[in-house]
């Protein structure tokens, strides 16, 4: 199976979302039936291969946010990094270019929210003990950030904003709302 996935990565680099089991089989020098024994469909093969690329992306975003200690900046940087990296990440493009667009619809799924929550809670330097947040409102913040990603991916604007312009746009309109919410005196503990 490792050889099949390695060949799939090679084919994705060449063919992108147009990669088929026939491409992978030809790259390996085996029959399509051999590949089908391990993966029942092209979609399943591409989904499995893309999971590895997505894990790499998540490690990269975690590295980028590791030193961030401001909640608004962490959300903004996460949105900007995701929006600007999708065009350069073949595996993210692969799942976004998938014809049914299930990823765009699933951007606020439980799994996506769990990943976003984990990145903010575990991968940043934010001092959470100084912020008393409820899990419900924190979940809403993560959902909002994911919806912002979804929006900028589906319609980047005309002309599209570069990373610095997008960062400033979000600092102007999103950061004040996050800071007002995070600084509100009401008791808000995670848990």
Regions found by a protein language model. Name each.
Residues 3, 23, 52, 56, ...:
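Amphipathic alpha-helical interaction segments
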